[in-house]
């Protein structure tokens, strides 16, 4: 739990240091929205220089996707930005509309040489979709096929530009 309010900066720094010593990649999932709460996931990212990968539910949008990305990208200008990925994409054509809606100035290279670009999208797929319920997702222990769903999601991610990034570089 990387909670700056509950645990304090020193504890969060120690947890990140420990995780970095034992892993090639650290993935931190924010709760609610990127800028929601005090401190927010954006506060955590900015405090520790953690690049933000915005995963945006694109299931019911096309051109608006670019506006959402632009807002996330520029709302706090000094926020480290890794790029954007679309979720719940309906088709290849939908994927192209989403990609085309993202403005060139919302992509590019960040200070420090991080390529902050279009990192692809995940199609709607029952093989890895998680059932939702009020106040959250179904927990893994309630899904007899949880590992198969996780494997399907990993395979889908591996086929995206995000999945092609060499974490050893």
List the model feature ranges, each with a label.
Residues 62-169:
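Internal gly/pro-rich beta-alpha loop/helix module
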Residues 1-48, 56-80, 92-96, 104:
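ATP-dependent carboxylate-amine ligase catalytic core
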């Amino acid at each position: 739990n990387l909670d700056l309010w509950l645990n304090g900066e020193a504890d969060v720094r120690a947890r990140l240091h420990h995780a970095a010593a034992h892993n090639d990649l650290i993935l931190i999932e924010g709760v609610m929205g990127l800028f929601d709460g005090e401190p927010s996931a954006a506060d955590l990212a900015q405090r520790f220089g953690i690049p933000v990968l915005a995963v945006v539910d694109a299931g019911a949008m096309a051109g608006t996707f670019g506006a959402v990305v632009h807002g996330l990208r520029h709302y706090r200008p000094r926020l480290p930005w890794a790029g954007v990925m679309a979720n719940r994409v309906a088709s290849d054509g939908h994927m192209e509309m989403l990609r085309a809606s993202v403005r060139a100035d919302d992509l590019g290279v960040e200070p420090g040489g991080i390529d902050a670009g279009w990192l692809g999208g995940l199609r709607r797929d029952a093989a890895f979709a998680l059932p939702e319920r009020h106040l959250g997702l179904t927990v893994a222990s309630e899904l007899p096929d949880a590992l198969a769903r996780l494997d399907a999601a990993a395979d889908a991610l591996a086929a995206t530009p995000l999945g092609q990034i060499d974490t050893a570089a």
